[in-house]
Amino acid sequence: LSIRYIILGGSFAIFLDSDHLLQFLDIELVSRMSHSIPFAVIVSIVFFVILRGKDIRICAVAFGAVLSHIAFDIFLADVALNSGTEFPLFSPFTFETVSLQGLDWLGIQIIGVSIVAIVSYFYKRKEIKLKNNLTKT
């Protein structure tokens, strides 16, 4: 991945906590709603539509950034507070929170990195195949 994707993923992962700004303004909302799997899927679809499907890696990076952010929050709660944390992982379908703690962050991080790696591999493979087809004709 290029540095552009790394910066985008990191920025997006930080941007996920912008819901805390709304809480400071006493706006009623479901806390950590952006820390959910449906949100990650929606963000990926939005990027796909905006980019007109030209680069699917951005979609994977966005999805991976949400998972990475969730993993970091779990890691931080475990290391700094010696406790777990809860997320509404399936909001807006259900607002029940899922408790995560300990090494749960590692599994989530591995899933996020794996998604980006697999999508990048297939994207590059397709790109090379197209390039080879163009040079043959």
Regions found by a protein language model. Name each.
Residues 1-137:
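N-terminal membrane-targeting hydrophobic helices
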